[in-house]
């Protein structure tokens, strides 16, 4: 089973896109460590945009890959601040429409 971790990137407070990406990647790494210790997620493979997208991808290309991975995952985990992120909202709506399990931080 797969669990897709959605965390805001563009909605972050850091001033440059590079800093936003670095901060979001650190956040995902921290979340993966926390989630891995949660018994609810013991059978899940954990993945996020940083597992399959290049840091220099266009936003459109990166989001298309993210949506693909939401569709092929069994569940989605929405991090703090997801409602302020267009990308996370798109991932949430995709998960909702396709009946995926949805977990919230």
Question: Where do the protein language model's features map onto the residues?
Answer:
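Conserved catalytic or regulatory cores that recognize and/or transform ribose-phosphate-containing ligands
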Residues: 1-105
């Amino acid at each position: 089973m797969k669990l897709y971790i959605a965390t805001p990137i563009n909605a972050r407070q850091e001033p440059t896109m590079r800093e936003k990406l670095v901060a979001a990647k650190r956040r995902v790494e921290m979340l993966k460590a926390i989630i891995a210790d949660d018994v609810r997620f013991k059978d899940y493979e954990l993945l996020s945009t940083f597992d399959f997208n290049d840091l220099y991808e266009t936003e459109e290309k990166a989001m298309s890959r993210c949506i693909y991975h939401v569709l092929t995952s069994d569940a989605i985990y929405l991090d703090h601040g997801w409602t302020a992120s267009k990308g996370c909202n798109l991932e949430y709506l995709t998960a909702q429409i396709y009946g995926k399990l949805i977990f919230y931080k």
